[in-house]
Amino acid sequence: MSFSFGFTSNDFDDDELVAQPETFVESSKENENTTAYINPLDSDFLSQAGVVQPNVEDLGTILESLKDVRLTFEEFQSPIYRKPLIKRELFDVKHQLMLETDAQSNNNSTELDILLGDTSEDLRKNIYEGGLKSWECSYDLVDLLSENVDRISNDIDAVVEIGCGTALPSEFLFRSALLRNDRSKGLKFVLTDYNASVLRLVTIPNLVITWAKTVLTKEQWYALQKDECEDIPINNEELLLTSKLLAAFYDDVQSRNISVTLISGSWGRKFSNLIHEVLSGSQKVLSLSSETIYQPDNLPVIAETILDIHNLPQTDVKTYVAAKDIYFGVGGSITEFEAYLDDKINSEHLPIHSERFKVNSGLKRSIICIETNKAIR
C-alpha cells in the first residue's frame, strides 16, 4: 500500500529518532518466566477513583442540551487535497460554557476550568485529554482517507474513532456518506472521547453543522433556523440549533440508515466490551485514532484497545493511527507504539500486520496502518 501525497514506507535512520528511557516491549514468553501476564486493558489503574469510566452517551439527550444554542463555525480545507471541513470555533465553545456556568453558579469543576482556558493547559491526565482542539494528525488522516474515499465508503459498514475530539476524519466520512446517499446499506459511526463534554460541545456540533451545510437547501437553511420567527438573524457562519433543525438532523440521519454512537470515558476492558457490543454484526470496520499515544503510561492500553477491535469475530478491521514521531516533554513516541505492536503480533502469532508511513511535514509525523489478513483495501 502507498499514499502518493507524501507518505513513504518505514525507512528511518537511527539519528532521526530520540530513544525513550522507558520501553513497553515485553513478550508473552518473558511473562511466563516471571509473573502471570496481565493485559494492559485489565490494569488496576484504569478502575481507580478519579478515572472516568466508560459510558454510552445518549445522542438524544446531547441534542436536547444543545437546543437554542447558536454555533459559530469555521469552514476550511485539508492541507494536501483541500477537502472541505468544518469545525466549531473554540471561542464559541468557551462562550457556551460561560453561559452555562452563569446559570449554574455553584459549578466548581476542575475540568470546566481547563476547558475555559483558566489554567492554560492543553490537557491534564484523567481530567481533560485535549479534545476541544483540532490537532495536526487529524488533518493527516483526512487527506489519507480522501485518496480512496469512494472505495472505503463502499467497503465499510462501521467507523470507530478512538479519542475523536473534534472528529474531523469521521466528519469527512460522514459528509461522504451524506453525498453518496446510499440508504440501502447501513453505516455505524462510533465516536469515543475521554470527556463527555467534548462529545457534546464539539463532536456532535461538528456533525450537525456538516449535515446542515451538505444536505439543506438555502430555503431549508433559513426555515429550520427561523422556526416561524422572522426576526431571528441568520448568516452563513452560524447555525442556530432550533428544535426543528435538531429533529430534522436526527430524522434525516436515521432515514439514511446512519447511526451515531457516542462513548465517553477511559480505555480498558469495560471500554473494549462496549465497542464489541456496539460493533456486533459489523463485517467491515474502519478504526481511526490520532494523537492518542502521547502518554507512555497509556501507550500499551491504546495498543491493546486497537488490537482488541481486530479480534472482533467474523469482522475485517483496518486501523489508521496518526501521531507525531516524538512527543517532546511528554514521553510518548510512535516508535514505542510500533515496537509494542510488532512484539505483540509476533509473540502471539496474530493474523495482523502493520506498516508505517511518514508524513512530509516540518514537524515529523507518521501514520501506522494495521490490518487483519482480509481487511478493507
Curated annotation (Swiss-Prot):
One of its GO terms (biological process) is regulation of translation. GO terms for molecular function: protein-L-histidine N-tele-methyltransferase activity. It comes from the Eukaryota. Keywords: Cytoplasm, Methyltransferase, Nucleus, S-adenosyl-L-methionine, Transferase. InterPro entries: Methyltransf_16, SAM-dependent_MTases_sf. It is an enzyme of class 2 (transferase). The keyword S-adenosyl-L-methionine applies. It is found in: Cytoplasm; Nucleus. Gene3D superfamilies: Vaccinia Virus protein VP39. Disruption phenotype: Loss of Protein-histidine methylation. Impaired early rRNA processing, resulting in a deficiency of 60S subunits and translation initiation defects. A haploid deletion mutant leads to hypersensitivity to echinocandin-like antifungal lipopeptide caspofungin, a 1,3-beta-glucan synthase inhibitor. Deletion confers sensitivity to the synthetic tripeptide arsenical 4-(N-(S-glutathionylacetyl)amino) phenylarsenoxide (GSAO). It catalyses: L-histidyl-[protein] + S-adenosyl-L-methionine = N(tele)-methyl-L-histidyl-[protein] + S-adenosyl-L-homocysteine + H(+). Its EC number is 2.1.1.85. GO terms for cellular component: cytoplasm; nucleus. Protein-histidine N-methyltransferase that mediates methylation of RPL3 at 'His-243'. Methylates ribosome-associated RPL3, but not free RPL3, thereby regulating 60S subunit assembly. In addition to RPL3, mediates His methylation of other proteins. PANTHER family: HEPATOCELLULAR CARCINOMA-ASSOCIATED ANTIGEN (PTHR14614), HISTIDINE PROTEIN METHYLTRANSFERASE 1 HOMOLOG (PTHR14614:SF39). Belongs to the methyltransferase superfamily. METTL18 family. This is Histidine protein methyltransferase 1. It comes from Saccharomyces cerevisiae (strain ATCC 204508 / S288c) (Baker's yeast).
